[in-house]
Amino acid sequence: MTAAAPSKPLPRTPRVRQAYPLDYPLLLCALGLLAFGWVMVTSASMSIAEACCQNPFHYSIRHAIALGLALMLGLMAYSVPSHWWERHGVWLFLASALVLILVLIPGIGRTVNGATRWIPLGPLNVQPSEFVKLFAILYVAGYLVRHADKVVNQLSGFIRPLILIGAAALLILMQPDFGTTAVMLATVMGMLFLGGASLLPFIVLLAIVGAGLVTLVIFSPYRLERVVSFLNPWEDPFNSGYQLSQALIAFGRGEWFGVGLGNGIQKQYFLPEAHTDFLPSVIGEELGLAGMLVLIAAFVFLSWRAMSIGVRAEALKRPFESYVAQGIGLWIGLQSFVNLGVNVGILPTKGLTLPFMSYGSNSLMVGCMAVAILLRIDVMLRRVESEAKFKRGTPWSRA
């Protein structure tokens, strides 16, 4: 049987030009966390700011400036189409990994509390490891698209991206920054699993990584002290267990609804890093269990929204966007879980910030970039869905 030739060419489908709405629940959740974070940083830092800078709003003002820079960087990231990230993700990751080397060079990197993680650039302190986490997601997403068959069917396809990721992780460990390393590796492993990698390499790699982490803890007095103090902070509440015991006291004082915004006591020289890593403890004291549940719900929603965008992208045959969205969802979920877990004493102290909230310009910038990329992906998916629906509804598309 021969196919019948069409009597006349089908008319071209006209392009639909319209503005597609943003994912407002995602946007409002992120903006709400940013605003809430600024309020709580202000509350948590007033005592220490008054003591060190003779201005109770010193850290609040700096945090507000960082918020402005982060939002501008987010707008810039939103204007970048996803295919640009796909094409340049590997180069962004390599460039940020090279900057990690600069951090470790004496005279370039800045050391705070025994950790060398920053490069001073005028009034800003750039923390490359924060950007490496995001660029690692972009790199691995692009790799999974380009080498999908190898990742699924060949061990070499599974190992190749881990060589670069492992090199960056080693540089971050040398700072030292154990928490960022763990979150980045866990996020990448989750993305490889979503990419279809077989289970056996995961088991072998997890065993190797687990043995390596145990070795690092055993042979590092600094890390060993943190683990021991985490297991029983009340054994030495005025030395190795001081930070965690003070955090738990803050949660205990907060009870159900807290002592009131600004009325917390633990932030007044009792709880170290109250406006950075241990900000949730201040929230727990001043807003109680109710405030903490709202905070947890916001992070759960943000992570779920990112994952759902990834599922939609996969259904529309947009694999890069799918991997990026799900990678960002994994990263936000993991980092917020680790930070909150450290504050309530179910995980050892890691030195990780709470995304979108803790004091620190680099974390805010990377968080805003990540949300902007998610919003851009969502708008692109809405356009694809709208055009597909339009084509299905035209008479010539059904001919």
Curated annotation (Swiss-Prot):
GO biological process: cell wall organization; FtsZ-dependent cytokinesis; peptidoglycan biosynthetic process; regulation of cell shape
Membrane-spanning ranges: 26-46, 65-85, 89-109, 118-138, 154-174, 178-198, 199-219, 282-302, 327-347, 354-374
Keyword Kinase: no
Recorded metabolic or biological pathway in which this protein acts: Cell wall biogenesis; peptidoglycan biosynthesis
InterPro entries the record matches: FtsW, FtsW/RodA
GO cellular component, one term: cell division site
Periplasmic side: 47-64, 110-117, 175-177, 220-281, 348-353
Membrane topology, as annotated: Multi-pass membrane protein
Membership in a protein family: Belongs to the SEDS family. FtsW subfamily.
NCBIfam families: ftsW (TIGR02614)
Function per UniProt: Peptidoglycan polymerase that is essential for cell division.
Protein's name according to its UniProt entry: Probable peptidoglycan glycosyltransferase FtsW
Species of origin: Allochromatium vinosum (strain ATCC 17899 / DSM 180 / NBRC 103801 / NCIMB 10441 / D) (Chromatium vinosum)
